[in-house]
Amino acid sequence: MKNSFWLFGSHHYVITDPHNTDLEYDQVEKRSKPGVKTPPHIHGGYTELVYVIEGQMTVHTKKGSITLYNGQYFFIPKGMPHSLEATQKQGITRTLQTFAPAGFGLLLTQFGTDSPENIPPVESIDMELFEKLSGEIGDITLGPPGGSL
């Protein structure tokens, strides 16, 4: 299985192959430059745990925003609208994200752009295809990358 992908301006490395866990969970290390923000979205079929290894990541929800620093984590239950934003001033933010049951790692293998880790591709996101594939695992995209909730 290929395990290194780019999506929405961040490099994702699938650490735990979901097929090796009987689809119980998958884990992804995400590396983001300052200012990179996901589209607002909902995971309808799985939970997400975001753990900051290095840098800072802000989790935006309808209840407000919380900034996480090295060693801190945030649990996102199924159905919670959210987006993630790398809010450090410089350098790379590294997070470990665990999805249970497996979900996002599967989506990355279907949709992520294959590219060497340190060479970001020129991404041309086919949002219609992304929404179709993410919808198959229960995800709902609520707006464009960088959009607000």
Predicted regions and their residues:
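A short glycine-rich, His/Asp/Glu-containing loop-to-beta-strand
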Residues: 2-40, 46, 98
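Glycine- and acidic-residue-biased ligand/ion/polar-headgroup-sensing regions
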Residues: 45-57, 62
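Acidic/histidine-enriched, glycine/proline-rich intrinsically disordered or flexible terminal extensions
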Residues: 109-149
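Short glycine-/acidic-enriched loop or helix-start segments at secondary-structure transitions
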Residues: 61, 69-70, 85-86, 107-108
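Ligand-binding loop in jelly-roll beta-barrel domains
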Residues: 21, 78-105
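Structural motif
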Residues: 11, 56-58, 65, 81
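Conserved hydrophobic/aromatic beta-strand scaffold that supports enzyme active sites
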Residues: 14, 27-29, 49, 65, ...
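Short acidic-glycine-tyrosine-enriched beta hairpin
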Residues: 20, 63-81
